[in-house]
Curated annotation (Swiss-Prot):
It comes from the Bacteria. This is DNA-directed RNA polymerase subunit beta'. Binds 1 Mg(2+) ion per subunit. Binds 2 Zn(2+) ions per subunit. Zn(2+) 2 binds at residues 814, 888, 895, 898. HAMAP family: RNApol_bact_RpoC. Its EC number is 2.7.7.6. Gene3D superfamilies: 1.10.132.30, 1.10.150.390, 1.10.1790.20, 1.10.40.90, 2.40.40.20, 2.40.50.100, RNA polymerase II, clamp domain, RNA polymerase Rpb1, domain 3. It comes from Shewanella pealeana (strain ATCC 700345 / ANG-SQ1).
Amino acid sequence: MKDLLKFLKQQSKTEEFEGIKIGLASPDLIRSWSFGEVKKPETINYRTFKPEREGLFCARIFGPVKDYECLCGKYKRLKHRGVICEKCGVEVTQTKVRRERMGHIDLASPVAHIWFLKSLPSRIGLMLDMTLRDIERVLYFESFVVIEPGMTSLERGQMLTEENYLDALEEYGDEFDAKMGAEAVLELLRAIELEKEIEMMREELPSINSETRRKKVTKRLKLIEAFFTSGNKPEWMILKVLPVLPPDLRPLVPLDGGRFATSDLNDLYRRVINRNNRLKRLLDLAAPDIIVRNEKRMLQESVDALLDNGRRGRAITGSNKRPLKSLADMIKGKQGRFRQNLLGKRVDYSGRSVITVGPTLRLHQCGLPKKMALELFKPFIYGKLEGRGLATTIKAAKKMVEREVPEVWDVLDDVIREHPVMLNRAPTLHRLGIQAFEPVLIEGKAIQLHPLVCAAYNADFDGDQMAVHVPLTLEAQLEARSLMMSTNNILSPANGEPVITPSQDVVLGLYYTSRERINGKGEGMAFSDVAEAEKAYRTGVAELHARVKVRITETATNEAGEKVKTRRIVDTTVGRALLSQILPKGLSYDLVNQNMGKKQISKLLNTCYRQLGLKDTVIFADQLMYTGFHFATISGASVGIDDMVIPDEKYTLVADAEAEVLEIQEQFQSGLVTAGERYNKVIDIWASANEKVSKAMMANLSKETVVNRDGVEEQQESFNSIYMMADSGARGSAAQIRQLAGMRGLMAKPDGSIIETPIVANFREGLNVSQYFISTHGARKGLADTALKTANSGYLTRRLVDVAQDLVVIEDDCGTFEGLTMKPLIEGGDVVEPLRERVLGRVVAQDVFKPGTEEVLVPRNTLLDEAWCDIVEDNSIDEMIVRSVISCDTDFGVCKACYGRDLARGHIINQGEAIGVVAAQSIGEPGTQLTMRTFHIGGAASRASAENNVQVKNSGTLKLHNAKYVTNSNGKLVIVSRSSELAIIDELGREKERYKVPYGTVLEKLEDDGVSAGEIIAKWDPHTHPIISEVAGSIKFVDMIEGVTMTRQTDELTGLSSIVVLEVGQRPTAGKEMRPMIRLVAADGGDLMIPGTEVPAQYFLPGHAIVNLDDNAPINVGDALARIPQESSKTRDITGGLPRVADLFEARKPKEPAILAEVSGTISFGKETKGKRRLVITPADGGEHYEEMIPKWRNLNVFEGEKVERGEVIADGPEAAHDILRLRGIHNVANYIVNEVQDVYRLQGVKINDKHIEVIIRQMLRKCEIVDAGDSEFLPGEQAEVSRVKIANRELEAQGKQPATFERELLGITKASLATESFISAASFQETTRVLTEAAVGGKSDKLRGLKENVIVGRLIPAGTGYSYHQKRAEAAAKPAATEAPAISASEAEQNLADLLNLAGSND
C-alpha cells in the first residue's frame, strides 16, 4: 500500500514550466489531443440518462461517468483500473478524466477560423494581400477565386463572379483552376512560400515612395516573418478538424421535472455536427452544386458561431431569444475566465458583519464576535479538543462545539491567542484596505474596529460591513503579523505621512484640552511638576484652560548619543501639562505647548515616528486617542442654533452688493458693457460680497471679549462649539460655517455655469422656496456625479494597475547619472511645494555644490532624509538633480537608488517591492475618494472673484520670463506675448513668487526694478482680451463693411458708437471670405512695419471683437485697438479633475492643441489657401525649411521674421504630451504630466508623492519607434520595447556592429497595457480576442515576468515574499540540470499503477 501512496504522490506533482507559448494548432495536433471522433449530435439518452455512444458526451471517448466503473457495469471497483471494457468500450478510470479528455470532429469541408478572418486587421487578408470583403465573398460562396491561372490571362487571386467564371470556362476550358469556399483560401495560403516572400519584400521596401504603401508592406512583412519564425503554417488558419471540449467543461445537468440545464456550447456543437453530417451525406449522394454550396456555407457559419458568436452577422440565439455564449465569450469580459476565475477567486474561512466602534481596543486589536470566531476557527478547535483529550474523535469534537460546552470557549481563547485575522472593507482601493489584527472575543454580533484605522479603510459606522479572513498556514500568519499588522502600517504609501492620525472627536478633545482661557480659575499658579498640576485640576483648584507656570523635565539625546535630562519652567496651561504626561520620553514639550489642531497632531505623530520609531508611536497614538475621547466627552461641546452667530455687517454688505449689481445692469442697458461682461462682473460682485460676509462672520465667531485679571477687557479665541470644531479640523470648514451663519452664496447649475442670483440667506435664517429650489440643483448634481464618477474612478485605477503591474524593484543600483531636475513649485505668490518636500526620500544623481563655490555639499548617491533636507534648506539651494524611475537604466524593472525611500516604511526601498501596483493604488485611491466628495459643499460655487492685478507679497527684484513688451506713451511696459511670467527674486537669487500674466498687462515697474511687499506691479482687465498696437500711426479699416462683416452699436445715453465684428457664421455670403482687420499706416499713408521685422503692422479681428475707434484715428504704441470679451468661467470641481487625470494618463490629444515649433529658425508665411495659413520656419543653418498649415482662426503668438526655438509655442492652446516629448525631450514631458496631475489633486487637498506618477510615466514610455535599424533585426518604423532595443544594441556594440537608433514613444495607459510583452496580462485586461489572435499568429511565448501572469497560472508573484522564490527558480534554471530520474510518459505511469493495484488487489 505504501508503494501505492508513493506513486499517487508522484502523479499529483505539478510540472515546472518556464513560460507559456501560444500558437496555431495543426490538424494533426488536434487529432493527437483527441480520444475519438464525435459523430452524432445526441447528448444523453432521455430514459436511461446514460450518454449516447459517439455523441457529445460519449463515455467511450471521454471517459466513465462514475469513478472506476464502466458504462454497462461489467467492471467495477479499483482493481479493474485501466481495463477497457469489451462490451461498451469504456476505460475503467476516474471520472475526472472527463474534464481533460478532448474529442474531435472531422469536417467534411475546411472552414476558416473566424478570429483570423474577422479580428482586425484580418490575418488571412494580410497574408493573401486581399481585402476582407473579397475573402468573405469567397468563403461564403458568392464568387470564385483563381488558384492556378495556368497559361491563361487570368491572375492568381483574381475574383470571378459566377458569370465571369462560366465565360472563362468557355474560353479556356480546364487550362485554369478557380474555386470557392474555404478550400480555395486554403490552397492559396498553402501556396505561399514564406521565405521567398520575405526576401522579395525586404528588397522592395527601400524603393517604395508612398507612405501608405510602405506601411502596408511593413505590416505584411511583419506578419509573414512572425509566421516564419514561430513555425506556424498559414494554412492552419483554416480548420479541417474541430476540437471538442471535454464534456465536464460544458455540463448537462438534469433539473427536477425532467428538463435539462445545458451549457450553450452543446447547442453550438450540435449545430456543427448536424450540418457536417448532412454535408457528408450530400457529398456521398453527389448532390447538385448549389445545394452542397449552401450546406458548406451553413457549416462555416455554425463553426463561426461556436468560436465567436456574433462576430459575423447576427448572433445565433437560443430558445429564449438570448444569444448563445460561444467559446470566445467564455474567456472575455468581466464574467469571463480571466477576470472571474483566474484573477479573482473566492475565499473560504471568511465571514462578514457590521462594524461598530471599539474605543477601548489597542491599535493592533479588533473585536471579533464569539459566534463568528467559533465558526471561523472550527478546524483548529477540533484539533485542539482532540489534542487535549477532551474529545476522542472529530465527530465528538463537532458535537461539543455544536452544544457549545464551556471547555470549547477555553479552547477557542487558546486557539485565537496570537493568531492574527485580516479585516477587509470593500472597496479595497489601496493596500491599507486589508490589515491584520489580533482578535479579542466579544459578545454581540458586530465586529469592533479601532477608530484610528478608519481613515485607512475609509470606514464609518453608519452601517458599513467588513469581512474577516483567517490566514491558515504558518507562513500566512507570519506574513500577516510582520507585514500587514495595523501597527506596521502607520505611514501612507501614497505620501509617507501618518495614516493613523486622530480625527473628529479625538481632535476636538485634544484641541479643547490644549486651549487657553484668559482669567480662568487658577490662572497664574506655579507648579513644581506635572503631577502637581494634575492634582490641582483633579481637586478643582485650577481649571483645564488656566494659564499657569509648570516645571517640566525633558529627555533629549545629545551629540554623543547619551540621554540627558533637562528641567525648565514653561508658561503653559493645565490641560497641556496633562497632555505632556502621555508624551513619549525624548519628544520636546513644545510639541504639545500649542493649540493642538489636526495638523499639529499629525505633525506630532510624524515627529514621533521619525525620532523614536514605530513602537513608541503606536503606543502614543493609542494614548492620544483615549485622552482625546475622554476630554471630548468632558468638554460637552455641542451644536446649538445659537452657536451660529450671524454678523451684523451682513445686511449692509448684501445691500451694497445689490446696489452695485443694479448699477452694472444700468450700464448694460445703456450698452456700455456686453451681456457676457455684465454676467462676469455680477458674479464677481457677489463672489467678493460673499468673501466679505464670511470674513465678518469668522471674525465674529472666532473672537470673544472677556475681562482679564486686571479688570481690563481683552479679546480671546472663542469657545463657540462650531468654531472649535472647524478651527481644530475636527469637522466642518469655513465654507460650511459660511452657509450656516453667513450667506449660502452663488450656486452652480447642473452644467457647471453659475446662477447669477446668489442665495443671500443662510441655513439659520432659512431659505424661501425659490432659494431652496436653486440649491437643490447643486445638491442633486453632486449625488448624480457621485454615482457616475465612482465607476469612472474604479476604471482608471484598473487601467493604472494593469499598466504598472509588472514593475518591481530588482537591483540595488543601475549606476545612471541621469535624473530629473527638481525646483520648488511656485504658483502666484505662494510656494506650493518647497524643494525639501519634493526631494525628501530621493537619491541625489549628481553632486550638489554649495552655492557660489566648488565645495560638494551633498555627494552623489546620497539618500536625502530629513537631516540632509535641513542642510539643503540652510544652504538655500533651489535646484538639484535627483534620481528618478523615469531615467532608471534597469531592464525589466527599476533599481533601489532610482526609487529612493519606501514611503510606507521610511527607509530605502527593498528589492522585490511591487512599486508599480503601489503607485497605481496611490493615484487611483484618492480619485475614488474625490469623486465621492464632489457634492459636500452642496454645489456652492467655489469661484473666487477674477484676478485683475498682481500684488507682491515679498520684497525683491522683478524678473520677466519669456515676455515681449512695448513701452506705451506713459512710459509703462505693456506685455504683448501670450505665456509670460513675472518672478520676484530675493537677494540670494532664490525665486520667491511667480505669476502668469496675460496679453495686454500693463506693468508698473521695469525689469530688474526693486519691488516692495504689498505693491501692485501689474494690472489687466480680466473680462476682455485686448489687441495691443505695437507701433504708432493712424488706423485703417480693411474689409470692415457694415452689415457684412460688422455692425455698429450706438449707446443711447452717451451717443458713443462701437463696432462689433460678426462671426463667420453670422455674416451674409458676401462676407464669408473677407478678413476684417486693422492696418496701421504712417502719416503719408504708407504701411508701417512691426519693429525689427519686415511684417506690415496689421491685426486680424476675430468674431465678437469690439472696436471703439473710428477709421483713420491716430494711435500710440501700447494702446488697445480692440477688445474681445472673454467667456464666463465654469466652477472647478474634481468632476473636471478626474477626466483630466484620465486624459493625461491616456496621453490623449487635446481638441485644439498648442502648435509648437518643430525646428528652430525664422518664421515666415507662405501662400495662403482657403481657410488656412502656411507657416514656414527656415532654420538658421540653412537646413531644410519646415512648413505647416494652420487654420486662420488660430491666434498666432509669432510674427513674420521672428526667431523661434524648437518646441516654442506658436499658437496657444493646451499642450499635447506627444509634442512635448518629441520636441522638448523625455524630462520635460515627465515634468509636464507630473505637474498637471498634481494640480488636479492639489486642488482637492490630496497629497501624492511625485514618484508614483513617475512610475506610471515610465510605463507609458516603455515603447519606442525604430528610426534607423542599423545592423539589428528590427524594421524601421516598427514599435519595440525600449529595454529590448537597449539589450540588442549592447550586443551589437560588443560585436562592433551598427546599433539601432530609436525615438521614445508615449503611449496612453490602455495602449501601453495592451502593448505589454506578456500576452496573458494583455488578454486579461481588454480586447481579449485581438490580443490572443495576434499572440497565436506570432507564436508568442510568455515568460511570466509580471505579477498578473503569475497569478493567472497560480504561482507566487515575483514580488514581495514571492520574490526570493522566483530568484531561486531563476538560479536553478541557470545551473546545468543535474541528472534526473528518467521521466515516464503518462501511459507508462498508468501501466505501473495498474500493476501495483493488481498486486494490492491480489494480496487482499
